[in-house]
Amino acid sequence: MNGSMTPTAPEVALANVVVDIERGAARAGWDQAPTLYALVPTARLLGDPLLPDEVAAHLRSGWDGSDDHLSAVVQEDMADDDLEAVLGHLAWPPEVAGAALTVERVVVPPEVEAQAPEDPEAAIEFVSNHPSRTEVRLAVGVLRSGESWCALRMRPFDSDDKVGQGSNLVPALVDALRASLEPVADEQA
């Protein structure tokens, strides 16, 4: 957040769309592939004369009427191999105000992570089979203007009222998404 106790309109809009994305992922269930979203101002989408009527009606039903309100536009499913590297190669058109993604991960307590083998494949096997492992779903969003928001749902506590939220819960994914929004060298010239 912005450092003050009162969030800005873009921060509220981002938090709302990230929570909506996470709840949509929850309705789809667990064991889903990562999904990438373009975050676009809803007013911009509604101003598109080529927007189908049924899509416009759906957008209007969730729109708060503000210029800050964001809609999540699903992109192609992503490979889960090296998500941060894939994000580093993305480029978004200027109409996109931000980006978001959902991804599922297995996490373990820090003391268990410290015991993991150094070999990456052996470490994955170790963590995936450890009795202290927990499956989580992350929804992470960032705006070009710098704001970020994350929502984290743990599989053992799979309920909307148990979703953790914060501006930087997953720093590596926040940074990778933010980098995908950086202007391409040709755009800077």
Regions found by a protein language model. Give the residues of each.
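Short N-terminal edge-element motif at the start of the domain
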Residues: 1-23, 27-30
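N-terminal interaction modules that seed assembly of large macromolecular complexes
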Residues: 22-76
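A contiguous, surface-oriented mixed alpha/beta subdomain in the mid-to-C-terminal portion of proteins
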Residues: 35, 56-57, 96-99, 180-189
